[in-house]
């Protein structure tokens, strides 16, 4: 009797690996783009929350002093935040998902270690809506 050999041939394994490689080549860039879009969505939502708090601050200042004003540091209007690192020291963030302010720019370090920033000017009541890559 002849022994039965079961299993995959080398050609079959190579074809499966090739198919997985092609699928990965298509899926990975899409996945990275999706992550980038989610980071942008989060940043816009976060800065919108800051904007709302700045407007509330300006309203309170008008009631107290008779003049609207925004704080020098936009991060100072935030309360407690989950999953966000807010650092009040100056400079560029060095941790993932950290936010810092340097006097004119509100910096955010994304999960892929890219640093993006939003322009801020308390004198002109200005906070940019879209980030710029550093």
Regions found by a protein language model. Name each.
Residues 11, 27, 37-38, 73:
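Helix-centric, low-specificity signal for extended rod-like, repetitive segments
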Residues 2-31:
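N-terminal single-pass transmembrane signal-anchor helix
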Residues 59-122, 130-134:
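Extracellular/periplasmic head regions of type IV pilus-like filament subunits
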Residues 36-63:
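Membrane-proximal N-terminal amphipathic helix
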Residues 29, 38-41, 46-47, 70, ...:
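Alpha-helix boundary/interfacial micro-motifs
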């Amino acid at each position: 009797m002849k022994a039965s050999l079961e299993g995959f041939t080398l050609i079959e394994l190579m074809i499966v690996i090739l198919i997985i490689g092609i699928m990965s080549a298509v899926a990975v860039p899409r996945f990275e783009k999706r992550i980038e879009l989610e980071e942008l969505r989060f940043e816009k939502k976060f800065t919108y929350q800051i904007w709302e708090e700045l407007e509330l601050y300006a309203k309170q200042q008008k009631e107290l002093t008779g003049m609207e004003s925004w704080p020098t540091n936009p991060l100072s209007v935030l309360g407690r935040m989950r999953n966000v690192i807010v650092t009040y020291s100056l400079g560029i963030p060095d941790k993932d998902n950290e936010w810092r302010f340097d006097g004119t720019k509100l910096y955010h370090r994304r999960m892929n270690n890219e640093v993006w920033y939003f322009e801020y000017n308390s004198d002109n009541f200005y906070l940019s809506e879209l980030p710029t890559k550093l």
